[in-house]
Regions:
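Post-signal peptide N-terminal segment of mature Sec-exported envelope proteins
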Residues: 18-38
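Extracytoplasmic/secreted envelope proteins and their assembly/folding machinery
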Residues: 19, 23, 65-76, 218, ...
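Polar/charged, Gly/Pro-rich intrinsically disordered segments
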Residues: 39, 44-46, 50-55, 81-270
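Mid-chain, structured segments of secreted extracytoplasmic proteins
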Residues: 56-92
Length: 270
């Protein structure tokens, strides 16, 4: 849910007191303790949870997910009426009880403002909101987030994260692709203006039709990379290098090539 909030003349949440105000708001409204750290232009919110994972099924607990959603909505309300100079919001919802699972959500804050003004669809907003899951046993018993590291997220890093996020969604939600491939692992680095992303695509089947034989995962990832670069009209990179570590195929694209690609991806998101 995207919360719409119209700020008045002055900031309701001044930069100096905004973290304390948001912490108190979440405590009062949701009876939940959060811990905020601002690193550069990135605001991190650590949310210790005992109800993020259902112990019987080892799946997500709806109560915990709903709590994270409400905390993010509260953060949106505050961010839309603060004079703090922020580019990114990063929320870590952590199971501190048993499993040590963390759900990470990263948002580029100008996207939030454009979503409020309906400059793109709700579905596009959620595709721009990066989600990731990781396992970290040091989270168990960590009620303040002291075991975690907090960095100032760069826009190059966010671009890499969003390409990976969109690729994961595509290869899970598109029936044809999910039947053929599993995206097992991903990684990224940035060097000399080139974004280097690695994807490990495992084949699920080898009894392929002639049409299926021609399908290459990186052909889709290439379009995703172009879509992200075009969406932001991003100009501060030399290009991208995409590698499928399973097939050992690599595609290198300059910024000019990325901007000229006609994006024709499956429309499962609409």
């Amino acid at each position: 849910m995207i919360t719409v909030f119209f700020p008045g003349c002055g900031p309701t949440y001044p930069a100096k007191t905004m973290p304390q105000q948001l912490t108190r708001m979440v405590k009062d409204e949701l009876q939940t303790d959060i811990h905020i750290r601002i690193t550069g232009k990135t605001m991190w919110i650590f949310v210790p949870l005992t109800d993020l994972i259902d112990e019987k099924t080892a799946g997500w607990d709806k109560a915990g997910l709903e709590k994270i959603n409400k905390i993010m909505n509260a953060a949106h309300r505050v961010i839309l009426s603060t004079d703090a100079k922020l580019d990114f919001l990063a929320v870590v919802g952590a199971d501190v009880k048993k499993f040590g699972v963390a759900l990470l959500a990263v948002e580029y804050l100008p996207d939030l403002g454009e979503a409020v003004l309906e400059k793109f669809s709700r579905g596009e907003y959620f595709m721009r909101s990066v989600r990731d899951v990781r396992f970290d046993p040091t989270l168990i018993g960590d009620l303040t987030g002291e075991t975690q590291s907090y960095r100032d997220i760069s826009f190059d890093e966010f671009i890499c994260m969003q390409i990976i996020h969109r690729a994961k969604n595509l290869f899970i939600k598109d029936k044809k692709l999910s039947n053929l491939f599993e995206l097992k692992t991903t990684s990224y680095t940035q060097k000399f203006g080139v974004l280097k992303l690695e994807f490990e695509f495992l084949r699920k089947r080898y009894d392929l039709s002639p049409e299926e034989e021609t399908i290459k995962p990186l052909d889709y990832v290439k379009q995703i990379a172009a879509e992200v670069i075009q969406n932001y009209n991003y100009k501060d990179i030399q290009g991208v290098e995409l590698t499928d570590t399973f097939s050992e195929e690599t595609i290198k694209l300059s910024l000019d090539e990325l901007k000229k690609i006609k994006v024709e991806l499956p429309e499962y998101r609409d």
